[in-house]
Amino acid sequence: MQHQVLGLGIAGLAAARLLRAQGYEVLVWDEQDSPLLRQRQAELNQEGIPVRLGQPFQLAEGVKQVVVSPGIAWDHPLLQAVRQQGIPVVGEAELAWIYLDHLPWVGITGTNGKSTTTALVAEMFKAAGLQGIPCGNIGLPLSQVALATLQGKLKPDWIVAELSSYQLEASSRLMSSTPGGPPRIGVWTTFTPDHLERHGTLERYASFKARLLDRAQWRVLNGEDPYLCRRRQDWEKTYWISLAAPQLCCDQDPTATLDLRENRLYIQGEMVAELEDFAERCPGQHNLQNLLLAAAAARLAGLPNVAIQKAIRSFAGMPHRLERVAQIQVGATPIRFVNDSKATNYEAGWVALNALSPPIILIAGGRAKQGDPGAWLRLIRAKVARVLLMGESAPVLAEALQGIHYTDVELVPTLDVAVERAFAAACSLSRQAQRLGKPAQPITVLLSPACASFDQYSSFEHRGNHFRACCQALQGSLEC
């Protein structure tokens, strides 16, 4: 047995197939067991790859290298024992790098905003007539892209990789000066506390994110992020974006500018795009930050302004990120249902509320993460008409809201009930405004949990899809 892959998620599945296609013997091992994993087990067995499920990880006999899926903790006891035996341990992203290091990469990381930024960069490459494959923590697993490239099924010009802290933690060689060079462009969107249950400390979490920037040839950073600004002297060849300042400048080239004025994007003085439609599809200041980060990366990659313009016009936004999934007209009042299930921490929850105008009915809760909810709670008090809380964190969050004298709170058992109760609350607000003679204005029912999904769902996508289905079913029932 030459290679052992730990974890049978989509990344582990792709890694196993990549290794097998290169002629290696492969064993896949996952401690979990489920119908989905058994389906994948059957597929791999047919491809000559044995799979063990539902057993604690063990090192198989004769293994020369262990490949780790992003969901497996890098300090897992088995991995510590493997390293002590001198057996190499690599992450799935690093494995893919071995086969993709001949291509230029844009690597994008950050606590929030990285998926939208990655998708925007990929859209800009597409608009330029180039294949910039969005992959990694978004889209295709990196190993799947590597295999498809080796087989000639994909012919990427660039790799546009969203890289999570889990992937960067397990990618020391990817982030080092190996033959083929480091990622060409590194982008860091934001930094706030997250995943501390995995990484232990904020400093350790930051160190994994910083790996990408330390090794990139060019860097694009959010100049409005307090943590990143404190590290301004750490990196050369860096572009800093800002909505507050009139321009983006490169430390080495002050003439390279990118700025927003009067809802227009300018690059080196040329008006590239009107942003009113983009702001409607992708609301919030954070999405303008994402746009600036993507445009800066695109310019560093040599893309023309016309490609950036075309991508801005065509970009439809991302599922589960302030995604409008339904609208119900109640008299003169439109009630909009917005899916922000990707908001899995307090900072993301704050960003969503900050992007929308009141009145807002908020659905929140799930499995709480470490972090300070203070700013999020204060914005709820300022902008939210009613809060519906679900999941493990509901009692704790309700108590926290009571602590700041916010009392329009209801605990609900499921998302189905939350949608029904939120719609009832929105209708009540509409009737109240009508009685008071106030002009009709849109009411937003917002799912922005500010918590992880794993208490009730398999992923934030699962939770967001359920919300979308509930809202569209409600809309359909009222249209009949």
From Swiss-Prot:
GO biological process entries: cell division; cell wall organization; peptidoglycan biosynthetic process; regulation of cell shape
Role of this protein: Cell wall formation. Catalyzes the addition of glutamate to the nucleotide precursor UDP-N-acetylmuramoyl-L-alanine (UMA).
UniProt keyword Transmembrane present: no
One GO term describing the cellular component: cytoplasm
Protein name, as recorded: UDP-N-acetylmuramoylalanine--D-glutamate ligase
Enzyme class of the recorded protein, top EC level: ligase
Amino acids binding ATP: G110, T111, N112, G113, K114, S115, T116
Organism: Synechococcus sp. (strain JA-2-3B'a(2-13))
A Pfam family per the record: Mur_ligase_M
Gene Ontology MF: a single term: ATP binding
Pathway: Cell wall biogenesis; peptidoglycan biosynthesis
Predominant subcellular localization, coarse grouping: cytoplasm
InterPro entries xref list: Mur-like_cat_sf, Mur_ligase_C_dom_sf, Mur_ligase_cen, MurD
The family this protein is said to belong to: Belongs to the MurCDEF family.
Gene: murD
